[in-house]
Amino acid sequence: MKTSDAFKLIVQIESSVDTDVFIWKGFNTWPLIRQILWVELTSTASNDKTSKKGSTLEIFASIKKIVLAIYYSFSEAKISQDNTKIFISRPVYLQELHSKKYFDRIVDPIIELFGLNEKITKFYVSNVPNKKELMYEFLVMHQSFSFNILTLDSEQKKVFQQITRLSSVSNLELQRRYKQKLRSFIRWFVAAKKILSKQKKLKEIYLTSWYFPDMMGICAAASELGIKTIDVQHGKQGKYQAMYCGWKKIPESGYALMPDNFWCWGQPSCDH
C-alpha cells in the first residue's frame, strides 16, 4: 500500500475505534497498535509464505532475546548515578570519519554542544560491532528478562475485529503482533525503570526513533519517574509519516509511551 494511503487509513481507523481499551499497568498502549498498522500496511511482504517464514524467525529471535536478557541481568555495567542528561541512540546512526572513528550523527553533535558543563552518559539499545571505535564513550542498555502471559479481553478483541474490517489486516496477525510488541515494551520498561530510578539528578533523556517498543518502554519509565524525554528526529518527516502525524485521539495528559517533546528538522517537519 502507498504510504499516503496507509496514513489515511490509519487516521480513519483511529477515528473509528475505541483506542482507550488497550491498557497495561495504567499505560495506554495505542501507540504500539499504530506502529503495527504502519508496518503492516506499508510492508510489501504480505503473502502467507513470507508470513510463516517471518513467524519462525521471530520465534528464534525471541528465544535469543530471552537468553541474552538473562545473561545481561547478571552482568550489568556500572552506570554513573549523577547524570543530568542521558542520550539513547541506535548503532544505525553511526558514521565513519576520516580518523576511522565512528560518530553518531544524531546525538553526538548535541553532546558536543553541552561539553563539560553536564554529566552525560550515552546508551545504545543494541550492541555496537566490536570493530567500530566510537568518538565518545557509551554503554549498551539491555532489555530485562520478563516473562508475561498476555491475554486480550473482549473489548480489545472487538477493536481488533473492527480494525480488520477496515484494513483487511489479519485479526490473528494483529493480536499476535500486539502481544509480541507489548512483551518487548514491558521488558524495556522494566530495564529502563531500574536504571533511571537510580538517577537522582537526571533531568532529561534525549532519544532517537521513539516509535519502536524499546524507546516506548524507556519513555514510559521516564514518565512514571517524572523525567523529561525528547525525541531528536533522525531526518525530515513528511506529512504521511503516521508515527509523527495525524494523531486524532491523544489523551489530555498525553501518551506516556511517547516523548514529551520533539526536536524537528525545520518548520515543514514541525508543521506536519
State what each model feature region is.
Residues M1-H272:
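Catalytic-core helical/loop segments in enzymes performing group transfer/polymerization on anionic/lipid-linked
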